[in-house]
Amino acid sequence: DTVKGLSPKGIRYLIATDYHGDHTTGSSFIDGIGEQVNFIAPQFAYDEILKGDNAFSKEIFVETLRDLGHTEEADAITRAAVPHPQFCFEDTMVLHLPPLTFEIRRMGGHSPATSAIFVPEEGVLFSSDVVSHTGGGMRDANLGEWIRALEWIESLPIKTIVPGHGDICGKDVATRQKERMVSIKGTMEEVLKKGLTKDETVADESFQKFFRADTSRGEYWLQQRKETFRIGIERVYDEVKADIG
């Protein structure tokens, strides 16, 4: 309702910046989606949505709500089908909507679909999970892509970042996140020198300092975060092993 009041024309475009449940589930509750409201998404997101709810972590989203006692909301989300985007892009798309321009760019990093939206006239970037106060989950990540995406953000003439999670911020948060990603890769490079197996490497205590989770979201969420963190470190292992040969 708040967004509707920003323009007499109401909502005209909805842009999904990822396929994860916290970026797609809300589209089920937008009046006129697919009709008055044009649904835009990266092709990667469209492909994942076609696979069904659990493919893009809707289950995690719903079960976290149940664990916190929000059963009515969880049931409503379970029943609501996520609509299919109508307009998709591989890498970039530009919306010319005078007086503003919306430059949409698939960045990758957090997931293959993760995209950002730059509004040059306002000096604003909607970064999705490329920038996140929580550091960002790595379950579907490629850290090399992520670091390059953050370097691109650092180069932009922007005053304001609307991150995927957390309060509106400046480029300092992007810089801190880049430093974190570089540190994770560097730690993996050092641990690999020990000659450990993949399982031993992933379990190495050196990585625990990078784990973050909002414990206020309940035990289910915490366990899911631990599991996705482990999967993320496995991905970093594969990525760094491939880099060093």
Regions found by a protein language model. Give the residues of each.
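C-terminal regulatory/interaction regions
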Residues: 193-245
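Non-catalytic beta-strand/loop surface segments
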Residues: 87, 91-93
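Active-site HxH/HxHxD metal-binding segment of metal-dependent hydrolases
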Residues: 4-87, 186
